[in-house]
Swiss-Prot record:
Protein name in the entry: Translation initiation factor 2 subunit alpha
SUPFAM superfamilies: eIF-2-alpha, C-terminal domain, eIF2alpha middle domain-like, Nucleic acid-binding proteins
Superkingdom: Archaea
Domain (S1 motif) ranges: 12-83
PROSITE patterns, per database record: S1 (PS50126)
Organism listed in the record: Methanosphaera stadtmanae (strain ATCC 43021 / DSM 3091 / JCM 11832 / MCB-3)
A Pfam family of this chain: EIF_2_alpha
SMART domains assigned to the protein according to its UniProt record, in alphabetical order: S1
Lineage: Archaea, Methanobacteriati, Methanobacteriota, Methanomada group, Methanobacteria
SUBUNIT field: Heterotrimer composed of an alpha, a beta and a gamma chain.
Transmembrane regions listed in the UniProt entry: none
UniProt keywords, alphabetically: Initiation factor, Protein biosynthesis, RNA-binding
Role of this protein: eIF-2 functions in the early steps of protein synthesis by forming a ternary complex with GTP and initiator tRNA.
InterPro entries assigned: NA-bd_OB-fold, S1_domain, S1_IF2_alpha, TIF2_asu_arc, TIF2_asu_C, TIF2_asu_middle_sf, TIF_2_asu
């Protein structure tokens, strides 16, 4: 069960629950992120239209996303609404919850690796990660991408930082996109070949690969985490190598498609 660092949700929060009781006047749902807590959805908060039969809208064991209307910790009451939430908000919140389920599983794997329970993991590191990074998965993702120092920097213990990073790197793969562009490079100097090689080598990196299609055309392949970043890197790489050639009395041009 994914856990929140706070005991109760707050007014306006979007909560994930499982409906466990449906009555004529409303429904009760166990809250997935608040252990032992439940929310009540009155029939008037089920749909914006007239509800003749509440079971046409909610049923037992159904996963729901609802907006918190009122919280009374003294009475143990949470009132929530299904109608005061847009469909895109509902979808995003459910996706977020599923991602956090995966993160909790990674935390559990990390804990077992050092002979600790999930409860101990939350108390010793889980809530700290949530406080520092917003949610558990973000902490694991950053550890996978940047290494254990990102955890050490927020006072995660070396033991936890090491094992969380190991588990993250094994189980989280950063999504990648790849785009391609082409440059035509021509040099009229006696050392023109060396100038072009220098220009192409200047743009090669972990994200940028250069291939010769056939003089004067060269393929530039960019691999990174998203398309806007890839387009920016491709444009900068093409401009850089063309600039070097032109500074040496040559010519260069960039095109996205391989010309016949």
């Amino acid at each position: 069960m994914v856990r929140m660092s706070k005991e109760w949700p707050e007014e306006g929060d979007l909560i994930v629950g499982t409906v466990h009781k449906v009555l004529g006047y409303g429904a009760f749902a166990k809250l997935e992120e608040y252990e032992g807590k439940e929310a009540f959805i009155h029939i008037s908060e089920v749909s914006s239209g007239w509800v003749k039969n509440i079971r046409d809208y909610v049923r037992e064991n159904q996963k729901i996303v609802a907006r918190v209307l009122r919280v009374n910790p003294k009475k143990g009451h949470v009132d929530a609404s299904l109608k005061r939430i847009r469909e895109d908000q509902r979808t995003r919140r459910m996706q977020q919850w599923k991602i956090e389920q995966k993160a909790e599983k990674l935390l559990e794997i990390s804990a077992k690796s050092i002979n600790k329970t999930l409860d101990e993991a939350y108390d010793e590191v889980g809530y700290l990660i949530m406080e520092e990074f917003g949610d558990l998965y973000e902490g694991f993702e950053l550890a996978s991408d940047d290494g254990e120092n990102v955890l050490l920097d927020v006072d995660v213990s070396p033991e936890w930082a090491k094992i969380i990073t190991e588990v993250a790197k094994k189980n989280i793969s950063t999504p990648e996109v790849q785009i391609t562009g082409y440059v035509d490079l021509t040099s009229y100097k006696s050392n023109g070949v060396e100038i072009i090689i220098e220009a192409l080598q200047s743009i090669e990196s972990d994200n940028v690969e250069v291939q010769c299609v056939g003089s004067p055309t060269y393929r530039i392949m960019v691999t990174t985490e998203d398309y806007p970043t890839a387009e920016k890197i491709l444009s900068e790489a093409a401009n850089k190598c063309i600039g070097i050639v032109e500074e040496n009395d040559g010519e260069g041009s960039f095109h996205r498609e391989l010309e016949d």
